[in-house]
Amino acid sequence: MSESLKNSQQFGNVYKNGKSFANKYLVMYVCKNELSINRLGISVSKKVGNSVVRHRISRLIRESYRLNDSISNSGLDIVIVARAGSKGKNYSEISSALMHLAKLHKIISSSEPDRN
């Protein structure tokens, strides 16, 4: 189960105190929170494309996270920033990039299969 990060103060806290890893499509920041659930924030800047493109990438990231949510640790604030390279990519590429970053952050174990 997870919720969303709601305001810029919550995002700023994750950027400031969290640890980040990146690949060519996404950057993931992770910071512990005081809750028993994960909170997810997604950021897609105007550099990536117009609103249609940005919203599509946001939906792909959210869906990939949702389908793999049951295998993740709890009590984390996670911010995922889409890079310009993510423009035009399909679900499997975004999901694979997200799972790669989750393994680097040790949110999921590397023995768990991708669910895409």
From Swiss-Prot:
This is Ribonuclease P protein component. It comes from the Bacteria. It comes from Lachnoclostridium phytofermentans (strain ATCC 700394 / DSM 18823 / ISDg) (Clostridium phytofermentans). GO terms for biological process: tRNA 5'-leader removal. Transmembrane segments: none annotated. HAMAP family: RNase_P. One of its GO terms (cellular component) is ribonuclease P complex. Consists of a catalytic RNA component (M1 or rnpB) and a protein subunit. It catalyses: Endonucleolytic cleavage of RNA, removing 5'-extranucleotides from tRNA precursor. RNaseP catalyzes the removal of the 5'-leader sequence from pre-tRNA to produce the mature 5'-terminus. It can also cleave other RNA substrates such as 4.5S RNA. The protein component plays an auxiliary but essential role in vivo by binding to the 5'-leader sequence and broadening the substrate specificity of the ribozyme. Belongs to the RnpA family. It holds the Pfam family Ribonuclease_P. One of its GO terms (molecular function) is tRNA binding. The lineage of its organism: Bacteria, Bacillati, Bacillota, Clostridia, Lachnospirales. Keywords: Endonuclease, Hydrolase, Nuclease, RNA-binding, tRNA processing. Its EC number is 3.1.26.5.
